[in-house]
Amino acid sequence: MGDTTKSKAHVLADVCSRFASGALDDASQILRKQYPFVPFENAGRKWTPLQALSIFVRDGFSDRYSGLPLVFPGTLRIISLRLPVDFPFHRNWKTDECHFAYWELAPTIDHVIPVSRGGTDDETNWVTTSMVKNAAKANFRLEEIGWSLLPEITGAGWDGLTSYFLDEVARTPDLLSDASIRKWANALQAITVP
């Protein structure tokens, strides 16, 4: 990243030099040729809970950028329902009203190559990560921020506490009155979790 950023900085230095000498057209040509504006396309992205869960399971409920274990969203919601003061939830995850575990431990889908940068919006370009990592990565490519993609987890191991979730919902069916828990329970029923 260093050399590329340095060379881009030097392109802008050349542009400023042209400004100083009154050569606005030259400055424009330098930018167009050496560091052109390329707008990021904001393509709509959407996946179903079932598609997301399939990716979470494929990745072993592990963050593919850090390797840290993540927790099934339905399980986080059960904890919040049982301990609302100690583990509060906010539907928009407001950090002053919601336990930070939702940001650190709830899995989400990230596009390895951002859709806005030419990546596909399908499972070949989707990986599991936390909301913290997803927000930090934003529309950057991995090499631009010095990250790498960890391999998929194979075999039985961490299940993101999905086993606990299934046992708890079976033991306490009224949990399904919560829309979020019901949504994730339906997705879990549709796939086999290792």
Residue ranges and their predicted role:
Residues L53, D59-F61, D110, T128:
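Residue-level detector of short, conserved catalytic/binding motifs and their immediate flanks
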Residues M1-S54, G60, G67-P73, A170, ...:
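A boundary/linker detector
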Residues D3, S7-H10, E152, A156, ...:
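Alpha-helix boundary/N-cap detector
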Residues S54-V57, H99-A101:
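Short, conserved, surface-exposed binding loops centered on an aromatic residue
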Residues D167-P194:
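Short flanking/linker segments adjacent to small metal-binding domains or redox-active Cys/His motifs
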Residues L68-W126, F140, W147:
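Histidine-centered nuclease catalytic patch
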